[in-house]
Amino acid sequence: MVKIRLTRGGAKKRPFYHIIVTDVRSARDGRNIERLGYYNPVAQGAEPRIVLDVARVDHWVGNGAQLTDKVRNLYREAKSQAAAA
């Protein structure tokens, strides 16, 4: 099964997450199929908090990929930001 989930990057006390498509059997920071965007929970100033390719997420969900709970919330937020812009 394929999932869209977060993989951690960044430094200690300064997390940064990539939003990726991966097989559920892969490790958190292991092999991925495609990188769809990123999430920066500690963004400051003009830095974007979420950058996500909504069209590619829709493509993967249409092909049977499942979103994790956190990615689902980020997807909704990115979609509403795109509609507002």
From Swiss-Prot:
Swiss-Prot/TrEMBL keywords: Ribonucleoprotein, Ribosomal protein
Cellular component GO terms held in the UniProt record: cytoplasm; small ribosomal subunit
Keyword Acyltransferase (UniProt): no
GO biological process, one term: translation
Domain of life: Bacteria
Gene Ontology MF terms: structural constituent of ribosome
Keyword Metal-binding: no
Listed InterPro entries: Ribosomal_bS16, Ribosomal_bS16_CS, Ribosomal_bS16_dom_sf
Family designation: Belongs to the bacterial ribosomal protein bS16 family.
NCBIfam families found in the cross-reference section: S16
Protein name: Small ribosomal subunit protein bS16
Organism: Xanthomonas euvesicatoria pv. vesicatoria (strain 85-10) (Xanthomonas campestris pv. vesicatoria)
